[in-house]
């Protein structure tokens, strides 16, 4: 016998083997090494064929999935700040408790925009959110795309040139308006103000339903804001009559109240000296964060635009290389990722929400402290897509990474905040960012509306809700403390009454023996378990007197709290109402002052333009006179 299995034929093992095992071993030993190699080779071939068939079946399944109208997923990067995560979680819980969070608005980024608009003041953001929900119901915003048909769009664009054209270098859509060519009088002749406002809202809804998701898929990062270019060449008082001012006021109110923080940055180009003077004055009334987004440029604006926009995405009339000649010009082309049929198909099938979203959670120093990689499987009926799970496994090289993907579950953002809080210590360990574990999580699309009152209380996370400050809350707290005190007194009373007889009957010898027994374990134990010092005997009457005294004190405190009035005194209420009225009056005066200042500045701009024209005319006259004198000589 030869081969590596001969070592098992030694006599010393025969005593430990049963007769059946010996027969099996003998039959195995009779096979030659060539036969075993042949068998191993056939097994390898079968394994290779099986894996090939499995791969082909995965490809066929993915092909069938695409032919059924579904599209492959896209990995989208979504960078989030840990503090913003915690703030959004608190805001979301507050909305859930007040039943102000419909399913279609249960979105992390939407709630974050409202928080940013109110500087992360949860109460103010909640009021703004509630007003938005009410406005959408009254205005019919949820169905405006299907219900409203703006037939006069072509005529409107002639008198109010505006369009979306391309994306900037970060993937945001570019919105362009040529304000110098706006004719408000003609605009109000072809449409009404109410219809134009509805058209404006419809375009905003279309942006959130089609344009922003398309840009998100194209850029592979979350997009929910735009870059705006305003061409103010030729703008004058004729462009800002009463109807134009009323329209702008209505549009700004709708945008600011219901679509906050959708402007990434704005470039005002071809701005003359008068406009710059006006802007420097108006800038002082704006929020510094808002004014930082607005860049007022002169006539040499191209280099600044090319820093953020590729030349092929910029229209020719703004100095770019795009003409869109085959689509009637850049103002009519509506160029962008939302015109790509494949991307639109993904958007209509929920690709932007169901994509494989790679979420990076950053700490205050900008370091990645956690990852979340939601892996949505495309499901139709009961057919789960094993192809995508297989591709996920192929992308991960290490066994540890594959193991982390073995238990997939969908988690709402409140758990992301918890994870962010628990992993806040990661930044203090060198090399931690390089080996962050990957966790499958659903980010926006899978939140369920269910009440959750508890907050995350770990380090760096959210604290528990604030204690109510009204008198009813104080009474409740006092009552709880009183009940806890009664329980403690009752427990103490029972303990003392049980131990008193045992203490009186025990002899000094037993006490000494117990002390010796405890001390035999070591010096430290003897120090901790020394016998108690003698105390005077407490009678049942003394205990009852003590408890009665404590109860009397607590009753006095509760009576003091109850005697305080539950309502604000009339004098203070009057003072508060007077202060509110004064604030309203000051706001009205401020609005009137702003309006007068605006009109004065516009008048000043006209005067400056008139002076420039007069100086130019005088200069031309002087040139002509000089030419005549030279000709005479």
Swiss-Prot record:
Bias (Basic and acidic residues) ranges: 19-38
Compositionally skewed regions (Polar residues) per UniProt: 503-514
InterPro entries to which the protein is assigned, alphabetical: CRAL-TRIO_dom (IPR001251), CRAL-TRIO_dom_sf (IPR036865), CRAL/TRIO_N_dom (IPR011074), CRAL/TRIO_N_dom_sf (IPR036273), PI/PC_transfer (IPR051026)
The keyword Cell membrane is annotated on this UniProt entry: yes
Free-text function comment from the UniProt entry: Required for transport of secretory proteins from the Golgi complex. Catalyzes the transfer of phosphatidylinositol and phosphatidylcholine between membranes in vitro.
Protein keywords: Cell membrane, Coiled coil, Golgi apparatus, Membrane, Protein transport, Transport
GO biological process, any: protein transport
Record-annotated CRAL-TRIO domain positions: 152-326
Pfam families noted in UniProt: CRAL_TRIO, CRAL_TRIO_N
Protein name: Phosphatidylinositol/phosphatidylcholine transfer protein SFH8
Compositionally biased intervals (Basic residues): 42-64
Bilayer topology: Peripheral membrane protein
Cellular localisation: Golgi apparatus membrane; Cell membrane
One GO CC annotation: plasma membrane
Coiled-coil stretches noted in the UniProt entry, renumbered to this chain: 571-593
Record-stated family: Belongs to the SFH family.
Region of interest called Disordered, as start-end residue ranges on this chain: 19-70, 503-534
